[in-house]
Amino acid sequence: MTPRLGTPVAPLWLCLALTLPCAPVFCADAGPLVISVPQGFDGPIESEENGGMTIAWVKRRPASDGGTSLQISAIDVGPSLDAIAPSERIQAASHYLMEFLKGLGQQLGHFEFGEFTQATLAGLPAARVRWTGAVAGHATIGIMYCVLIGHSVVSLQTQDIGSEVTPQMYSALGAIEGVRVR
């Protein structure tokens, strides 16, 4: 229960609320999804082309050009997804995840990925994979998901420089795993 402002408890409640730690998070629409963007991720950076959209945020590292990215891409493929039975949606998500990986692999050197695993995003079956590669000679790591929502194929990803998942990536993964359908 929240105290009403006219009660003697209200000033005490307000003082207490102001002393609690707060991690500013904001919600953003990303195609058919809503995501709670973690604290410190700047953006969005948006682009639209060929019936698809991409939106991304970056948590920059001090004294560095790089940072951790959080990216969502959605492609409207029309009613073709309507014919996919619920029991086949994880297979379809895995198929499209492989297509997204092929595109990513063309941009990276030494590209490798692990086994696909099943996940649930916004209550829907999703495919997930961890990958590694190199950008300009620097090791890069990422985790990518794919989920089918309505008429959209949606890819969600976080990546960073290095060979291990970073704390910033874990923050982005929490946001990805907490998405909601709009």
Predicted regions and their residues:
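N-terminal secretory signal peptides that target proteins for export/translocation
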Residues: 1-7
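Bacterial N-terminal signal peptides
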Residues: 10-21
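N-terminal "mature-domain start" segment
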Residues: 25-58
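Soluble non-cytosolic domains of exported or imported proteins
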Residues: 32, 87, 91, 95, ...
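Surface-exposed amphipathic alpha-helical segments
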Residues: 38-43, 153-182
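Conserved polar/disulfide-associated segments of primarily extracytoplasmic proteins
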Residues: 50-142
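A short, solvent-exposed beta-edge/loop patch
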Residues: 143-153
